């Protein structure tokens, strides 16, 4: 079937009065930023009690209101999904595309086995693995693919090139890149790849290394318009057997739904503290932040771990997506985020379904190395998304505007108070941060019916110490194009992110030492200083009590998880019920 790549062949959903909506959207963004900045600079206090040393600023009130609205809309979206009576027609053809690069063999096998066990008609589901590399060290991935899908309709091919490295005939080599992308000439490799992808059900392609975007492009381009929907996932993901069905339901529900993402969870959550906190953070991101965005039909980032797109829309912007540049250089990061951006730019809705889920592993150094590239792609796509805010709900403008400036305000607050020469201010700053996080975590615990979600309040400390400097570095190096990670077969040994963490730690510790030095020289015998010392002491006591409580809950949660893993699956007694509520 001929591939359709002309965007004019795809209906674009445009809002009424686009110019007026654009003006209103940008005006709202400017007023919002001005209001938040003014409230912070002037330090206006909505509530103040000198005796109890309590102040509640306008900025804090706005943050509390934001979290409240986010929780309400997310809850409404989850309820709407639960009440939806949609039934999958099982008539749509789906291609499950997997991108792989030197993957851990165990992770890859689990991924492929989960794909094989997918509850979707085999005649309607294709499984395509594209391996980024065709050397001897990459062959093991194809061998695993053959083992898992032995007996299926399998096709494999080792391609010595890729779509953008094969030799163009000399008479065509002088033409522009846009003409090359239309491929008027097709060599034997391209023809073989496209024939396998369109005629076989399970296909594995090894091609010349070119990065994640290159392997994604190969799968998308080779499929052409042969399927209705394209499901993307990474080679370390374990898919739930109903993941495809639930995503197809959403796209079938409304033709204006251009893409939909699923719920990604961490399956090795108790391997380390970082993996445990990541699992809690994943729940919060997907079931609060993304669910809230889905309520307004404008999910700004559908993860590459589990996302489905309408193929006709994807084919329309495929070449533009592949050739995307930033500040004149090609962007090898943010491939999945830019896919979502292109769907939004055409006026289509982007949705989320918590009923479709997948499981991903988490390791500390890899997690740390990914934070800066992820943040960098977020800042880049923010500038792109700003062009399409007017096509969607005003919530998209509001959330994007507040999200981009949040790291700056947090940094300013931290540095100002750390160097304020007041230990009392520092202690109560962190105590208030934990109290706010605890309130949010209690809501998440109630929503998820798991006591362990209370530990999500610890994420605020993790954000301040580890993630905030990564975001600042990402903004300062926004033009940098390297990805910074490697395949899981090799242990990640990139310690560069630790350098930025060291600088940030030095800044915070410097402020703390300065305030302690001033405090040691202070005359605490005066009545005002004596009252401040009293507040400092019970603030420290409250902060220590919080950490003791969180430590106990974490230890109990870990013990309960081990009990559940050792329990017999058929046993359903009161003990197993209490364990499930804890973890």
UniProtKB/Swiss-Prot annotation:
Q: Which Pfam families match?
A: Glyco_tranf_2_3 (PF13641)
Question: CDD domains from the entry?
Answer: GT2_HAS (cd06434)
Q: Would you indicate the residue range of the signal peptide?
A: none
A Gene Ontology biological process noted in the UniProt record is: hyaluronan biosynthetic process
- Where it mainly occurs, coarsely classed, is membrane
> By its UniProt entry, which Gene3D superfamilies does this protein fall under?
Spore Coat Polysaccharide Biosynthesis Protein SpsA, Chain A (3.90.550.10)
> Molecular function terms in GO for this entry?
hyaluronan synthase activity
Q: Keyword Transmembrane: yes or no?
A: yes
- Chain ranges sitting on the Extracellular side read 51-52, 415-425, 479-497, 557-583
Transmembrane spans: 30-50, 53-73, 394-414, 426-446, 458-478, 498-518, 536-556
- GO CC terms of this entry: plasma membrane
Membrane topology (Cytoplasmic): 1-29, 74-393, 447-457, 519-535
Q: Which domain of life is it from?
A: Eukaryota
Q: Where in the cell is it found?
A: Membrane
Give UniProt keywords alphabetically: Membrane, Transmembrane, Transmembrane helix
Q: How does it sit in the membrane?
A: Multi-pass membrane protein
Entry-linked PANTHER family: HYALURONAN SYNTHASE (PTHR22913), HYALURONAN SYNTHASE 1 (PTHR22913:SF13)
Similarity field: Belongs to the NodC/HAS family.
* The protein's name in its UniProt record: Hyaluronan synthase-related protein
The species this protein belongs to is: Xenopus laevis (African clawed frog)
Q: From which lineage does this chain's organism come?
A: Eukaryota, Metazoa, Chordata, Craniata, Vertebrata
Q: What gene is this protein a product of?
A: has-rs
